[in-house]
């Protein structure tokens, strides 16, 4: 396994990587700096088409545009790199965190806890209606689906747990929650995640400096070191979905990571690529109508 620092972004809180197959580019966000980043691995070009107050995650719509999940329950569209109209879909004093589209075009989206209430997990349906899935969540984080589309994964960071639910693709309902992976002894806290073409789970470890691979039964298969501690999320990308991109946090948000020895943490906030013996699956696309 090799690890390469591909973009020196110095994100304060890099998160939410997603591969856009139409554009052949990777998108991710710096939540606290309010920047939407994109990277073209063929040319090496990197830019930030959107800068706003807060942007917590994006999904790719079926028409190729993006849904951008922000703060105070707001969701907007990004078309050709320009942020368009936004709508408030939930009443929340906090920001969104991780988001994921499901096979039918819905979006599961978590909000951070406030001083008076825990975080929540919502399901945004294609017609714009919203259903509360979970309440009282510490920090809602990475999500995914099994290969057969019959199970849904949801990470609760403070509980150090990845949960697994029965999932109904027709209705979007989830039920029968069970603990899939508990990791009290694994370095760091479980953060973002993805599911590969073999059904294995790749879990980023906040303050653990690594990505952990599990098989479909929850057995740990390996740990892959990243040269900075705050590893936030992962996504497979590239034309063949054979590169594992890793977002990180802890930079100063000025857009360029440190140039020193990576082992000292100077690479905090950069985007990395891990060359692992695995391939991903195309991300499901959202198909949500706002407003």
From Swiss-Prot:
Induction: Transcriptionally up-regulated by both L-arabinose and D-xylose via the pentose-specific regulator XacR. One of its GO terms (biological process) is D-xylose metabolic process. It catalyses: L-arabinono-1,4-lactone + H2O = L-arabinonate + H(+); D-xylono-1,4-lactone + H2O = D-xylonate + H(+). This is Pentonolactonase XacC. The active site is at residue 191. Disruption phenotype: Deletion mutant shows restricted growth on L-arabinose but grows on D-xylose as the wild type. It comes from the Archaea. Pathway: Carbohydrate degradation. The gene is xacC. Its cofactor is a divalent metal cation. Disulfide bonds: none annotated. Its EC number is 3.1.1.15, 3.1.1.68. A divalent metal cation binds at residues 15, 141, 191. Belongs to the SMP-30/CGR1 family. Keywords: Arabinose catabolism, Carbohydrate metabolism, Cobalt, Hydrolase, Magnesium, Manganese, Metal-binding, Plasmid, Xylose metabolism.
């Amino acid at each position: 396994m090799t690890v390469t620092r591909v973009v020196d972004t110095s994100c304060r809180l890099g998160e939410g990587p997603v591969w856009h197959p139409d554009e052949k580019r990777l998108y991710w966000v710096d939540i606290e700096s309010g920047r939407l980043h994109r990277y073209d691995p063929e040319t090496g070009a990197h830019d930030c088409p959107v800068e706003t107050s807060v942007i917590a995650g994006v999904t790719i719509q079926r028409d190729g545009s993006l849904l951008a999940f922000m703060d105070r329950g707001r969701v907007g569209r990004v078309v050709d790199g320009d942020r368009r109209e936004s709508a408030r879909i939930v009443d929340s004093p906090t920001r969104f965190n991780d988001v994921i589209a499901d096979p039918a075009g819905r979006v599961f989206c978590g909000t951070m806890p406030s001083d008076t209430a825990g975080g929540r997990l919502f399901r945004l349906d294609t017609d714009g209606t919203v259903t509360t899935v979970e309440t009282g969540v510490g920090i809602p984080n990475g999500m995914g689906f099994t290969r057969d589309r019959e199970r849904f994964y949801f990470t609760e960071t403070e509980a150090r747990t990845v949960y697994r639910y029965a999932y109904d693709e027709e209705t979007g309902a989830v039920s029968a929650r069970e603990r899939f992976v508990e990791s009290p002894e694994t370095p760091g806290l479980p953060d973002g995640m993805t599911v590969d073409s073999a059904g294995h789970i790749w879990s980023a470890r906040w303050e653990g400096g690594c990505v952990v691979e599990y098989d479909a039964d929850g057995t740990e298969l390996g740990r892959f070191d990243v040269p900075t501690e705050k590893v936030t999320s992962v996504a497979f990308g590239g034309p063949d979905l054979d590169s594992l991109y890793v977002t990180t946090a802890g930079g100063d948000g000025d857009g360029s990571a440190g140039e020193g020895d990576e082992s000292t943490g100077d690479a905090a906030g950069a985007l990395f690529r891990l060359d692992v013996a695995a391939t991903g699956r195309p991300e499901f696309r959202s198909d949500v109508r706002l407003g």
